[in-house]
Amino acid sequence: MPDPGWAARTPEANDLLLKAGTGVGTHLANQTAWTTLGASHHASGVASAINTAATAASWLGVGSAASALNVTMLNATLHGLAGWVDVKPAVVSTAIAAFETANAAMRPAPECMVNRDEWGVDNAINPSVLWTLTPRIVSLDVEYFGVMWPNNAAVGATYGGVLAALAESLAIPPPVATMGASPAAPAQAAAAVGQAAAEAAAGCGMRSAYQGVQAGSTGAGQSTSAGENFGNQLSTFMQPMQAVMQAAPQALQAPSGLMQAPMSAMQPLQSMVGMFANPGALGMGGAAPGASAASAAGGISAAATEVGAGGGGAALGGGGMPATSFTRPVSAFESGTSGRPVGLRPSGALGADVVRAPTTTVGGTPIGGMPVGHAAGGHRGSHGKSEQAATVRVVDDRR
């Protein structure tokens, strides 16, 4: 639609409006682009036609004929698109020519401004010269309003009309492309678009769910940390009570330590008394029969009786200390009358009673603090222990 403002604007305003743009530079760039695109479409159509003609001889069957038909239709559509593009450079060329014509036909804005300036000066000095400038003022008005204004308005309107027509030519849509070899291509494209939209929605849902789970995990972690902090504070509060409970057994152990100190001090004295009470420790060969009997019987009363029979020596440390005695070890040889059948002992074989010397007890002088032992065989009484001589059995297997 042409601009209706051409007739309403002043001549200088229309001229400035037409020349205020970029001129024909953008028109020329657009014309070159359309020309290049049309040439490309023509070249593609020609190349496709040559390829079809070269390979159609090797196509067989109904499918080959359908393919050749589709290629021909596509090439025709491409050439139709190239023809639609070929019109555009001519349209742009017409617009360039219209702009140049309008630019040349327009009365320049400086000329229009000079007319108006002179008209104003003449009107200012006309009374002083007795209105002798009135004819000049009228001619200036006729030139401005009768020539400049109508001219520029007409040129602008004409140029606007040409551009409106060219715009309608440019608005013609391109030819519709024919269906290709795959009729299901549009449906597949629509399905692909739908699938992409569904995947995008699913991705957004998964991200939202992950963010929710992450937020929940963060809250749970904070709750767990709070519980751990409370447990640490509780254990810190219980530490003084545990220290008090540990100090109580240590305080109870102090009296027992005081009781153990005198006993530890008495241990060297007890060791010394035990040394004097053992005759064998001082090199004495004999031991008191009464003490031996007391050790064998294990009775406290028997030990007291034998100690009284031995001479009543004084004991250090009181009457509760038992006498030390020596017990003869058991013989390693069995007796000859053990009940098992044995052979006759040959003459000349030695028995245990011949080999073993009689055991004697050597009496000694009493030592202070130790009872005196009796001689061997003295005062054995009913507490004596009968001894049986051990024999050695020798079996001669040489016969």
Curated annotation (Swiss-Prot):
Gene3D superfamilies the record matches: PPE superfamily
Superkingdom of origin organism: Bacteria
Disulfide bonds: none
InterPro entries: PPE_dom, PPE_sf
Ranges for region Disordered: 375-399
Similarity comment: Belongs to the mycobacterial PPE family.
Protein name as it appears in the record: Uncharacterized PPE family protein PPE69
Originating organism: Mycobacterium tuberculosis (strain CDC 1551 / Oshkosh)
Gene, per the UniProt record: PPE69
